[in-house]
């Protein structure tokens, strides 16, 4: 078993620590999160692999919604152990894309326990999703859309 901490990104502390079998897939972890946080099981969700700064990487969705089947690795095809295996491994879990609940999921430790369970429960899920600010840092400002287009194309670059 491994111990995993799930933390809601919010002003209030909402934390669950659970023991799970690392050989189960991410869909199983998704269901465990739903159960332990008492969330609606009918909402869409995705895990995102992150780096040490929690920058978003590859999305691992619940379902493949791409035009070609098999183009996307889904939760069902990804073992927990392949993404949560050391103290440095973290995921971001986005639940309910309309309200954008965001959770940090991190590996805590390996455990000799043999039963999956919740080992720590702190706080309750608020009724409304926290307001998250997604800030983008711009290196330089673009004066206008026309300037941006003018800079992007060179008439002499193409043959007619």
Question: Whereabouts are the PLM-identified features?
Answer:
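Short linear regulatory motifs enriched in tryptophan with gly/pro/ser
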Residues: 1-160
């Amino acid at each position: 078993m491994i111990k995993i901490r799930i933390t809601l990104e919010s002003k209030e502390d909402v934390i669950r620590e659970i023991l799970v079998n690392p050989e189960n897939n991410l869909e199983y972890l998704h269901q465990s999160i739903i159960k332990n946080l008492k969330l609606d099981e009918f909402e869409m969700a995705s895990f995102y692999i992150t780096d040490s700064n929690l920058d978003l990487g590859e999305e691992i969705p619940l379902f493949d919604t791409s035009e070609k089947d098999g183009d996307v690795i889904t939760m069902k095809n990804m073992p927990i152990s392949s993404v949560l295996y050391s103290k440095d491994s973290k995921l971001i879990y986005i639940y309910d894309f309309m309200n954008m609940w965001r959770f940090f999921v991190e590996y805590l430790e390996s455990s000799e326990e043999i039963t999956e369970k919740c080992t720590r429960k702190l706080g309750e899920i608020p009724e409304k999703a926290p307001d998250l600010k997604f800030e983008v840092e711009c290196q330089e400002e673009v004066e206008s859309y026309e300037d941006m287009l003018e800079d992007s194309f060179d008439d002499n670059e193409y043959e007619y």
